Amino acid sequence: MLERFHVPEDVAVRVKQQNVRSTIEGIFTKMGMSDSDAVQATDVLIWADLRGIESHGISNMMRRYVEWFQNGEINPNPKWEIIREAAAVCTIDSDKGHGLVVGPEAMNVAIERAEKYGIGSVSVTNGSHFGAAGYHAALALEHNMIGLAMTTGGVTVAPTHGSEKLVGLNPLAIAVPTMNEPPFIFDASMSSVAGNKIALAKRLGVDALPGWVADSDGTPIMEEKPVPDDYIILPLGGTREVGSHKGYSLAVMIEILSSVLSAGGAGANRRGGLASHHFLAYKIDAFTDVDQFKKDMDEYM
């Protein structure tokens, strides 16, 4: 996490993990979730906070989750189901279930199918925000698998050279096991800056860096200044000169795999739920020797 996003020490309040855990679990159950689902949802938020991903942690997300519960955009007791499948792949209708709960469930389905077929691929439609993508991808590590997780973020990004919000933030994560080194985990949105970091910047009163956002007509803001109210987030890369077409195209790729593939539409024409997701699990020993793979990863790291 960049230093500008840290809460100033003079106003920071530190609490024991167990204390905050019980509080957040209590909020989730108050919203109607089962005890077990509340525990799972809290796990994802604490995982993010402990790794410095404050944009997807408790303080930045809980207010929004409560709002989404209250306005019906998150169903506290979903009856998610597999609506289409073929061997190693399937599509799940999340029934607007909380992504912090249905996300791990879907990733585990991908892992189960990878155990049987060598690879597992699961699309989720009619879903909601699933927190830090890295949490879901990392579930594959203990199974000697490579995990990928991606999701459709808010449609707040302009295409390269564009002046309208037509593209999702669309984060992607990959988790790769190693032998002795820490696992390789990459987790990032395909925008110049995560949307939740913009919300965090506005909450903390800190400036946006050059190339993060554009003004209302799509002109990139190339000086450090406060985030304007009518901002548009730029694709990863910021401007065409430094590669924003790559970030834009990666965001489109994730939109296709997560939303279009699960019959959820795309961009401003999405339908059903707050988000769609896609999860992949690769069983390493279906491709190569696991120990050799991990040794090679150690050397690479």
Question: Predicted segment positions?
Answer:
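Phosphate/diphosphate-binding glycine-rich loops and adjacent basic-rich segments that engage nucleotide
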Residues: 157-228
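Secondary-shell segments that build the walls of catalytic and ion/ligand-binding clefts
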Residues: 206-266
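Flexible, glycine/charged-enriched surface loops at secondary-structure junctions
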Residues: 33-40, 55-58, 263-275
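Acidic, glycine/proline-rich low-complexity segments that act as flexible tails and inter-domain linkers
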Residues: 1-17, 21-41, 58-73, 207-209, ...
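A generic, well-ordered mixed alpha/beta core segment in the N-terminal half of proteins
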Residues: 89-179
